[in-house]
Each structure stands twice: as C-alpha cells, then as structure tokens.
Regions:
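Conserved thiamine diphosphate
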Residues: 15, 142-192
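Structural motif
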Residues: 53-55, 95-98, 123-127, 171, ...
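Active-site-proximal loop->helix
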Residues: 112-116, 136-150
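Conserved small/polar residues in nucleotide/adenosyl-binding loops
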Residues: 193-198
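Conserved active-site and cofactor/substrate-binding residues in soluble primary-metabolism enzymes
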Residues: 34-39, 79-83, 92, 112, ...
Length: 198
C-alpha cells in the first residue's frame, strides 16, 4: 500500500484546519495557545464563516494569533479588545467578531471594557486564555494567579493578605445580565505516570 492509497479523505482521522497556515508556532512548550488556535479555526470553518470572521487581539502572547490563522485581524490597545470588537460588530453586524485575550489583558487593564461589553449584551465572543501568569514578560503574578502559586513577583506564592484573591472572571461574567453564555474549559493534557517497580 502506498502513501497515496492511505491518505484519502475517507481514511483521515485528523486534518489541519485550512485557516491555519504553516508558520512555525513560537509558543513555549506546554502552552495551550496552539490548541485553542486549532479549535477556533475548526469552528470558523464548520460555521462557514471564513470570509466573515474578524478577530481582535491585543498584547501579550495572545497578540500573535494573527501569525497563525488566516482571517481578518485587528490589533487593539492593551485591554481594549472588547471596545474595538463592539465597534466592528456594530458597523458590520453580519460578521463573526471575537476577541482573543490573555489574563493580563482581560482581567487587569481590560476589566472595565470586558465588564461593560458583557453587561451591555454586545453580540461578540470573548475568548479568554487564562494561564494565571504573565507569561510573555517573565512569569509575574497576574490578577488570576492562584492562591499559593509561585511567580517571579510572588516567590513564596500568592498570599491573599498581601495580594488579594484571584479574579474569577468566568464567575463574574456569568452574573451579568447581558452575558449570553459562559463556559470554562481546560485544553491541557493530563498524563498519569505509573511505575511497574515493586
């Protein structure tokens, strides 16, 4: 059997989404951005919205998504992606408009824009990548860093008496009357290692 005999549509288990280009990903090992990029591309293709999708990405690691997905992109100032998405959606209501934001952007400087866009019930999708740390700038504590989690700026772990509690953005968003849908997902793989040693 040749390679051509095997690689046929009816034999394929996986196929890279056509919206994903061949640029090598620059993300750190173990980072979930690439997995989320693939999921976004698959959903846009399934919806048949390739020509009508507009993504907004601000700063941090999230901004580089435009290097990997071949759709229309607009960069936003730090924390302002929901405001820009609102403007684009109001100008072009037939577009699939979404933001792609990290925790430093959405849960820190962009908290106001996020909360107000949700509370107004803007017809946009916000994809929030929460890795609980400022990954691009050296591993500093983020607004979502977990209690006890060690970072370069909290080497003994997040202490609620010094740093307060982590913001639970999905919980906050779910309580706003304008929010249509909130879900929290994990895109990491958990491996269980066992030892056969007696």
């Amino acid at each position: 059997m040749t390679k051509e005999d095997i690689i046929k549509p009816e034999n394929l288990v996986y196929k890279k989404p056509t919206l994903m280009n061949d640029n090598p990903m620059h993300y750190c090992p173990g980072c979930s951005h690439g997995v989320v990029h693939k999921l976004i591309a698959e959903v846009i293709e399934e919806m048949g919205m390739e020509d009508k999708a507009v993504g907004i990405s601000p700063v941090g690691c999230a901004v580089f998504i435009y290097n990997y997905l071949d759709i229309d992109w607009q960069e936003a100032a730090h924390g302002r992606a929901p405001a820009l998405a609102t403007a684009i959606k109001r100008l072009w209501p037939d577009r699939l408009v979404f933001t792609y934001q990290g925790d430093g952007d959405l849960a820190c400087i962009g908290t106001a824009e996020t909360i107000h866009a949700l509370n107004r019930g803007e017809n946009i999708t916000i994809i929030f990548i929460n890795n609980a740390i400022y990954g691009m700038t050296g591993g500093q504590m983020a607004p979502t860093t977990l209690v006890g989690m060690k970072t370069s700026t909290s080497p003994y772990g997040r202490d609620v008496h010094l740093h307060g509690y982590p913001l639970k953005m999905a919980d906050i968003a779910a309580q706003l009357e304008g929010t249509a849908y909130v879900t929290r997902q994990s895109v990491q793989t958990c491996l269980l290692y066992t030892s056969d040693a007696a």
